[in-house]
A protein has these predicted regions:
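Alpha/propeptide regions of enzymes that mature by internal proteolysis
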Residues: 20-375
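Bacterial Sec-dependent N-terminal signal peptides
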Residues: 1-20
Length: 375
């Protein structure tokens, strides 16, 4: 009996470890390019990520995620950027100025749908309080969202400006927390618990040696596919989010960063490829989904000064014919980031006792073995 108990406990412990491992650690290798050290958006030098997670009582299941392209005054030294809209049923704040000028001037904030105005105000406060910004009278806050209203009391608008500022302050490089954290706390993906996911790719030196990093906030539906395996079909689960959320549609926010010297035009081309990565996981960009890709170049030589003594801006940018490897790296990193979010997320119960189960990792691993998809 004692021996049997030890076996059971050992099995439970092993399954727990499997659930916490990232897909790549378990032998699921997506794509052909190598990852960075952390397989995260923070593999790009200077990029930082911070989370504030709000889990309180029975119905608060939300949070904030902040992504900083570099550690400095972004209003005074802006970075090239572009935004691609896969499906525009969303409330992304700051889009039109980025589209018009091709740069961003604040950190990127992700949160829930009804907390976008709060996050915008927090970014204004953050910017106005920075040294050298004493005369600033216009700030283009960049805030993305997904609707976490099935698990979270979204109408309560529990995210505060202090939470947003805390997420920015907590932002750091290195390993990035995934799953039920920050803006991914209350999200749902393919009918399972979604969340934050991240991944990276490093091009070989012969192709420039540049790094692509992706971070996602997954809250969308479709027919789940992992590394070419039709998981939903095999499990017999064609779970669309609408079956759970009825009229409360969600989104997928995708943040792409690279140290490659790109202008806004080629960043938009890069952003479009991220949607191909989403499609490879079985995402369908449904009518009610807000699927946005924000692409940013962190190349220091191409930062854009707010105030300059010259009228000329002379960036150094890659040629068009050097873009294809970056396109492929973006697709791979986006696909893996989404899968990472599913592996990291855990079962959650929230508002009105609504429960969303984690993806059945053990069954997924069995399928990977069945189709020889493990390295």
């Amino acid at each position: 009996m004692k021996k049997l108990l030890l076996i059971i406990l050992s099995l439970i412990f092993t399954l727990s470890l499997i659930a916490k491992d990232r897909p790549r650690d378990l032998g699921i290798e997506i794509g052909v390019f190598k990852t960075g050290k952390y397989n995260a958006i923070t593999d790009i030098k200077g990029v930082k990520v911070g989370h504030v997670t709000l889990i309180e009582g029975n119905d608060i299941r939300t949070g904030v995620t902040a992504i900083l392209p570099y550690d400095g005054n972004m209003f005074q030294m802006k970075v090239p950027a572009a935004i691609h809209i896969g499906n525009g049923f969303g409330k992304l704040a700051g889009y039109s100025q980025v589209k018009e000028l091709g740069n961003i001037e604040t950190p990127i904030i992700l949160t829930n749908t009804l907390s976008v105005p709060t996050a915008c105000n927090a970014l204004i406060t953050y910017t106005l309080d920075q040294k050298e910004n004493e005369n600033v009278r216009s700030v283009n806050s960049l805030v993305g969202e997904t609707n976490d209203g099935w698990l979270n009391d979204i109408r309560g608008r529990h995210v505060t400006e202090a939470d947003v500022l805390k997420a920015i302050k907590k932002a750091k490089g290195g390993k990035v927390e995934e799953g039920n954290v920050g803006a991914g706390t209350g999200t749902i993906c393919f009918g399972y618990k979604g969340g934050i996911g991240t991944a990276s790719r490093v091009l070989p030196k012969t192709l420039g040696g540049y790094t692509i990093g992706v971070l996602v906030q997954t809250n969308f539906g479709g027919k789940l596919e992992i590394n070419g395996v039709q998981v939903a079909e095999e499990i017999g689960d064609y779970y669309y989010r609408e079956k759970i959320l009825n009229e409360a549609d969600g989104s997928c926010m995708i943040i792409v960063m690279t140290d490659a010297p790109l202008d806004a035009r080629n960043l938009e081309r890069l952003a479009k490829r991220a949607m191909l990565g989403l499609a490879k996981t079985g995402g369908i960009a449904s009518n009610g989904s807000g699927d946005y890709v924000i692409a940013v170049s962190t190349a220091e030589e191409n930062r854009i000064p707010y105030d300059s003594e010259t009228r000329l801006y002379t960036p150094s940018v890659l040629r068009n014919d050097a873009m294809s490897p970056l396109f492929m790296a973006t697709i791979e990193a986006t696909e893996e980031a989404i899968v990472n979010s599913l592996f990291a997320a855990e079962t959650m119960t929230g508002r009105d006792e609504h429960k969303v189960d984690a993806m059945p990792v053990d069954r997924v691993m069995d399928l990977m073995k069945k189709y020889n998809k493990l390295k």
